[in-house]
């Protein structure tokens, strides 16, 4: 178990999930949203927001896993992120988390910023103000949710 825990920690540290985890922790702490659900909803959003800074590594993953053979790193990376979104859709994981109060967002972002910086290695450094955008995107993803599913505080609708 110790070795498995170490390997999991190493994987998390090297996989750019720092902001995903930090935001998920703040949502779980404030609203009781299930950590796994929050992570699943946040991952494609945060990867999209990282933009070009992660194209090379995500493109490599896309090619290694057979998700994309696109010559362009941008195209391959976008295919990889889209594949994550499709897996979420297939598992009926919503594209949004309802119940996040706008007045809480600055405090939540400050908590996430404090946790993620400098504890997690991330491809792009964001401050609390920039992290607020992620919370707003989590609410706005409903417009792009292909499953029609939503959640209220982490409970299936």
Listing of model-derived features with the role each one plays in the protein:
Residues 1-86:
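Active-site segments that bind and position negatively charged phosphate/pyrophosphate groups
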Residues 58, 68-157:
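C-terminal charged capping/lid subdomain of soluble metabolic enzymes
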């Amino acid at each position: 178990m110790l070795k498995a825990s170490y390997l999991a920690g190493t994987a998390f540290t090297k996989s750019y999930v720092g902001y995903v985890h930090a935001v998920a922790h703040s949502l779980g702490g404030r609203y009781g949203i299930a950590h796994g659900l929050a992570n699943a909803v946040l991952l494609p959003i945060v990867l999209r927001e990282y933009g070009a800074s992660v194209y090379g590594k995500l493109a490599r993953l896309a090619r290694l896993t057979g998700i994309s053979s696109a010559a362009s790193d941008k195209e391959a990376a976008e295919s990889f992120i889209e594949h994550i979104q499709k897996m979420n859709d297939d598992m009926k994981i919503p594209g949004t988390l309802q119940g996040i109060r706008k007045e809480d967002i600055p405090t939540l972002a400050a908590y996430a910023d404090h946790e993620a910086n400098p504890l997690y290695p991330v491809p792009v450094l964001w401050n609390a103000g920039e992290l607020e955008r992620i919370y707003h995107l989590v609410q706005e993803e409903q417009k792009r949710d292909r499953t029609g599913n939503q959640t209220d505080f982490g409970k299936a609708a």
